[in-house]
Design a protein with these regions (language model features):
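N-terminal amphipathic/basic-hydrophobic helices that include classical n-h-c signal peptides
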Residues: 1-25
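N-terminal basic/disordered segments at the start of proteins
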Residues: 26-40, 107-113
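N-terminal glycine-rich anion-binding loops that anchor highly charged ligand groups
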Residues: 27, 36-81, 91-99, 326-327
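Glycine-rich anion-binding loops and their surrounding alpha/beta cores
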Residues: 32-35, 90-93, 117, 132, ...
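Short amphipathic alpha-helical face segments that pack within enzyme cores
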Residues: 66, 123-127, 326, 330-333
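Active-site cofactor/substrate anionic-group-binding motifs, chiefly glycine-
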Residues: 75-139, 143
């Protein structure tokens, strides 16, 4: 079930195509696959043709998979990714939160790093909301991890099936919302089997990195964790092209070979800005912000039960120091991005106070009460 911005049930139907148009579209997807195999970049119009074909059931899953594999084999460009994002943004369910979007931030990761880390971004959301920021998080249940952002936030009391009207009230009363991706992107329905088949054979596709670019709330600011260093400049450029107000794309390098889709105190972090921060291109470490380097083991998470217990430990001041500092660092960066603090360093101690001083625990309790009512 999905909802329109007034909270009424809405069913998505692909736009109709006549038989001649359909034939052209089917041949176009095959033709585009051939062009990709030769190394040619797709235009925005060609991306739209391909995206529309992927949304329907007219092309076989094999044809769709061949196209996505050819695109990945060529290597998706920032322009192609931005063009795909525009198509799917236009077909997302509108939650009607435009009044908050210009002040809002999304704290999100691409996933897919297989690092087994804790749901850092979920607690960062709660710190930022406690600081007075407006947060619009967009995500899903765990796919390559045992516990995704949706899993943890649901465990903390968030109703994943809340109507847009309820979510608008959450923005007023809690300062944050979570857009559960399956409820806002019905156009993905006919793509899901293809993605599953590709994943089964270890093949990534553009859809592995598209989620953070198609938040239905359209927040003006984004702090994006990226699973691969090579994708940092591409996704920053794509978000810049999409008109994002400000933000950073970041990738943490664990030991020179492994990486994580987080900015952490245990890694050297490649960062690239976009929007107002587009001139930032740097490598950051914890020490740049007055924090200590930590072992990566401090960031490890588990399944939902384990992560809920770890959340309790963090809030009680018993969590691993590296995990606490990483949550604090990301929250401080988020505050700086949205303008709540003039520098990241200025936000570090404030974020720590909110996390460990009871404000986040109170936010979680308020969240449970809000969604239970």
């Amino acid at each position: 079930m999905v909802f329109n911005f007034q909270g009424r049930a809405q069913i998505y139907l692909p736009e109709p195509f006549g038989s001649a148009s359909l034939a052209r579209r089917m041949s176009s997807l095959i033709d585009l696959t051939t062009q990709l195999a030769s190394g040619r970049e797709l235009t925005a119009d060609e991306v739209e043709v391909a995206a529309l074909a992927l949304m329907t059931t007219e092309d076989s899953d094999e044809v769709k998979a061949d196209f996505l594999a050819a695109l990945a084999g060529k290597g998706e460009t920032a322009s192609e990714v931005a063009s795909f994002a525009r198509v799917f943004r236009a077909r997302a369910v509108d939650p009607g939160v435009q009044a908050w979007a210009s002040r809002a931030i999304d704290i999100v990761g691409t996933g897919g790093d297989h690092a087994g880390g804790f749901n850092i971004s979920s607690l960062v959301v709660l710190v930022l909301a406690s600081a007075g920021a407006v947060v619009m998080k967009h995500g899903n249940r765990g796919v390559t991890s045992k516990c995704g952002s949706a899993d943890l936030l649901a465990g903390l009391g968030v109703n994943l099936d809340a109507t847009p009207d309820k979510l608008r009230r959450a923005l007023d009363e809690l300062g944050f919302v979570f857009f559960f991706a399956p409820g806002y992107h019905p156009a993905f329905k006919n793509i899901a089997p293809v993605r599953k088949a590709l994943a089964a054979r270890g093949q990534r596709s553009v859809f592995n990195i598209l989620g953070p670019l198609i938040n239905p709330g359209r927040p003006a600011h984004v702090l994006l964790g990226v699973y691969s260093s090579a994708w940092v400049p591409k996704l920053a450029a794509a978000l810049d092209s999409l008109g994002t107000g400000s933000g950073l794309a970041a990738h943490g390098v664990i030991d020179g070979q492994r990486g994580i889709d987080e900015l952490t105190t245990a890694t050297r972090n490649r960062v690239q800005g976009f929007g107002r921060l587009r001139d930032i291109s740097a490598e950051w470490t914890a020490e740049d912000f007055g924090l200590s380097l930590s072992p990566f083991a401090d960031l490890q998470g588990g399944d939902l039960a384990a992560n809920l217990e770890l959340t309790k430990s963090v809030l009680a001041g018993r969590g691993p120091q590296g995990l606490v500092d990483t949550i604090v660092l990301n929250a401080a960066i988020g505050m700086w991005i949205v303008g709540l603090r003039p520098t990241v360093r200025d936000g570090v101690e404030y974020a720590r106070e909110l996390l460990l001083g009871g404000a986040v625990a109170r936010k979680i309790e308020a969240t449970r009460e809000f969604y239970a009512s």
